[in-house]
Structure formats: C-alpha cells, structure tokens
C-alpha cells in the first residue's frame, strides 16, 4: 500500500504536487486561522467587557464608595455642627456628594441605577429629616439653656435676699438682746419679740430648704435632658414631685403671711414652681426635648440603614461584576485550551506534511534533479557544449531537460556554423587588408611616379656638380694644391649626402607599412616638411606655400602612415588650387588629443559629393580613383585617430586630423 502510494506520488507532476501541498497547507492554515479568530473574538469580547463594563463599573463603584465615605464623614460633622451656619454648609456639601454619586451611577447597570436612585432619594429625604430634627433639637436646647439661666438667676436672687434677711434677723436679735439687758422690766416683751424673730427665721430657712430642693430638682431634670437620660415618664414624676414641694411651700408660705419681709422669697419660689410645673415651660420643654432627641435618634438609625443599603448595593454590584468576570475567564480558559489543542494538532500535521514533502518529494524529485540540471547549465555556461544533461522524467523538469538538450543541439550546430562563418570572414578581412595595403602602396607609387621628373632633376643637378667638383679636385691634386682639393671634395661629399637624403626619403615613403607595427612618438612638424618635399614638383609648379606652426609636437602613430595621410591631404589641397596655393596648418591640444587643421584657399568641398567624400571611389577630379581620403580615414583609425571634413569661415576646404598626444618623456 505504501509503495503504491509512493508510486502514485511520483507520477504526479511538480505543479500538481505543489498544488496539493499548497491546498493542504492552506486548509491547515484556514483551520488554525479560524480557531485563532474564534479565540481572538472571545478574548476581544472579554477585553471589551472589561473595558466597556467591568472596569467602568468597578471604577464607578469605587468612586461612589469614596464619595459615600466623604458624605458619611460630613454627615457625622453635620450631626455635631456647633451652629446653624456650619450645619447649612455641611448640608450643601452632602447634597453635592449625593448629586455626584447620582452622576457616577450612570456607569452601573439599569437595575442598579434604579435601586441607587431610590436610595439617593431616601437619603435626601433623610437628610431633610435630620436637618429638621437638628433644628428642633437646637431650638429645644436654646430653650433649655434659657430655663437653666432663668433658674440660676432666680436662685441667685433668692440667695441674695436670704442673706439679707439672715443679716436682718441677726441684727434684730442682737438689738433685742441689748434691750433685754438694758430694760430688765420689759424683758418678757423683748423675749417674746425675739421668739417671733427666731420663728420667722426658722420659716425662712424652711423656705430656703424648699427652694434648694426645687432648684436641685429643676437642675437635675435639665441635666438629665442634656445627658439624654430622660423620657416622658420622668416628666410626669418631676411634676408630681414639684406638686408635693409646692404643697409644703404653700403651708410654709401661709405661715409667713404676717411677715412682709419674706414676700420676695415667696415670689421667687412661686416663679421656680411655675417654671417647673406650668405646661408651656419646663414640662413642654422636656417633652419637646425628648421628642426631638427621639426624632434625631430615629433619623440616625435610618441613616445607618440607608448607608447599609448603599454598601449592600455596592457590594452586590462588585460581586456581580466579579462573578461575571470569573465566568468569562473560565469560558475563555476552556476556549484557549480547546483552540490550543486544535492549533497544536494542526501544527503537528503541518510539520508532518512538510517533512513528508521534503523527504519524499523535494529531496528525491526536485533537489537532486535541480542540482544535476544546474550543474549541466553551469557546464554549458562555461562553454562546454558537449556536456550531457542527466535529467529525465515526464514532469516539468523532464520537459525542461528535453528542451535544454534540444536547445543545446541547436547551439552546437549554430556554433559550428558560426565558427565556419568566422573563419570565412577572417579570410575575407585578410584579403581586404591585403587589398587595402596594395592600394596604399599603389597610391604611394603613383605619387612617386608623379614626382620622378622632379627627383631626376633634383638628382641630376647634384650629379653634374659632383662631376665638376671631382674634375676640379683631380686638377688640384695634379697641381699639388691639396687644400683646394680637400675643399672641393668636402663640397662633393655634401652633394652626395643630399642625393642620399633624397633617395632615403623616397625609399622611406615607398616602404610598405606593417599592419601590426606598434605606435611610437612621431615629430608631426618634421613629417609635414617631409611630405611637402615629396610634393615639391606639384607645389613648385603651382607656386604653393605651406604655413606651419613654429612649435614642435609629438604624436602617437607610425611615421609612414602619417606621411601617407599628409601626402594625400596636401596633394588634394594642391589639386584644388589652380595657382598660388596657400595651405595653412594649425593645431591645438584638446585634453589628451591633438587636433590638426589643414585649410587651403581653394573653392571648397563640392556640396553634391560632400556626404560620400570619405567613401571609396568618390572624387571630383577628372583623373583619379577617389580612394585617397578613404585610405587616409583607414590609416588614421589604425593609429587610433580620426579624420573629419570641415570648412573655414571663408568656405574653403578644411581637413581635421585628430592624434593622441605623446609625452616628451616618452619621446626621449
């Protein structure tokens, strides 16, 4: 089964195999992507819940709790406010905190906002009740303070009056004792009067004791009110106690009706009893105090209940958010575990697929064959067209190998054809060069032939003079005139040197130039002079003149070729001028090149032939082959120079030659 599967895999083409591997990888990637996307979606949901709901709720809850704590602290200060101004300021601050809590509740859920709104409304109502209870308590305390001050004032008046009476009683008794001692006869009368004073004093002391009991009871009741240890039952007991004291006081007061000095004391006791017993005074004050204290206590209990509802709501909200967050976390952990397992399985399958693809397909079917094919291509690239391509098969690599073998066969055939064509072209080029060389040599011989008459004349004159000098030298020797003979022979030697220079110049010009002759420094001005001397017959008959610069320049080239070019150019210039030919030569350096301008005073270039003057067999002369300029162009190219045609400002013909400048050091 495994071998059959491997065989089926080997029969698949590379594209189908790669397509199958790509589809499998894409399927695994799709599975991993879907699982990852689902996990990402769940994580994103939890993050959105955390950012949009959980953290805002927690933040709002903490802010609400913070403002609630501030409100509680200020409420405690509100309960202990020393005056109405401070209480009103604290009430305003508490209301502001409640309003802020209401604004912060917008971050909670709807049900929680509704519950919190009810609690806030109850809190505002409770705050109003507390404020009312505190206000009533403040009024009652003011009234209690007034009663306490009134009792103290009456007690002080009673004490002052009592002290005055006691002093008066003491004075009366002292006076009576003095009178008894002074008037023994009226002693009984004075003793009776002394007993009456003592009886009055005793009644006054009884009133003082009753007054002290009344004051102590009133003060005790008021202190009990202030300490919060009183209730409605004690008020009734207080009234009954004062009624008993009033009965006792009335009995004593009736006994004092005969003593007008005690009227003030009796009135003070009546006022104290009125304070303690009249309904709209101390009894109502005590009842109002107890009621206000009870209302304040009830409001405080309601405050604790409201705060408990606040905290219960906040704890429930925090607990609900925390529970929901835990549920999200547990669900996300489960999803992460499942998705992680799926991703792990898909990763293992992808690794298994990659290993199988690499082991059974890439290494065996692709890498080895690609390597062999690459080595064959490298050998072909190195020029080894006889290399073999050892790759076969029916897949893409096999087809590429077959195409490459076919292409290699065609390349070999084309290479052989190209080699044959190159050999033929080399033969043709050699023939062309030989023919060009023959043409150059023919042109040289034509120039020599044209100058033979001048050369014969130039050589004939020195020969005639030489014959005469030799005859003169012989006669001088016969006559023994050795000095004259020596001078004559010296002149003859100069003529021989002149003839030798003419012959050498002619031989130098007619020497065949070798194509492979290396370039060397050439004195361009001297070469111009030599070429001009070769054309002496022509320029003398036309009264020609050659103008050369005075400076010496050295160029890179071959003297024979340069002389041939100059002879062709100067001959054309002389032919263009019928008489009085003037040929002006100038040169200038352009970087590493020397440009030579050769201009004549002839009619200029023929416009009709100007585009083809540098082509072979193009001439405006009646007699001539028209190959001089084309040969000159070829010779300049061989010396890495150039020849161009131009015109002067006066429309005379001008030939521009370009040479490479040679250093003086190279010349030396």
Curated annotation (Swiss-Prot):
Location(s) in or outside the cell: Cell inner membrane
Listed EC numbers: 2.7.13.3
UniProt xrefs under InterPro entries: HAMP_dom (IPR003660), HATPase_C_sf (IPR036890), His_kinase_dom (IPR005467), HisK_dim/P_dom (IPR003661), HisK_dim/P_sf (IPR036097), Sig_transdc_His_kinase_PgtB (IPR017116)
SUPFAM superfamilies noted in UniProt: ATPase domain of HSP90 chaperone/DNA topoisomerase II/histidine kinase, Homodimeric domain of signal transducing histidine kinase
Superkingdom as given in the UniProt entry: Bacteria
GO molecular function: ATP binding; phosphorelay sensor kinase activity
Keywords assigned by UniProt, alphabetized: ATP-binding, Cell inner membrane, Cell membrane, Kinase, Membrane, Nucleotide-binding, Phosphoprotein, Transferase, Transmembrane, Transmembrane helix, Two-component regulatory system
Residue numbers bearing the Phosphohistidine modification: 457
GO cellular component, one term: plasma membrane
Domain Histidine kinase: 454-663
Reactions that this protein is recorded to catalyse: ATP + protein L-histidine = ADP + protein N-phospho-L-histidine
Domain HAMP: 364-416
Membrane topology listed for this record: Multi-pass membrane protein
Transmembrane segments: 20-40, 342-362
Main location: membrane
Pfam families: HAMP, HATPase_c, HisKA
CDD domains reported for this sequence: HAMP, HATPase, HisKA
Cited function: Member of the two-component regulatory system PgtB/PgtA that regulates the inducible phosphoglycerate transport system. Activates PgtA by phosphorylation.
Protein name per the record: Phosphoglycerate transport system sensor protein PgtB
Taxonomic lineage from the root: Bacteria, Pseudomonadati, Pseudomonadota, Gammaproteobacteria, Enterobacterales
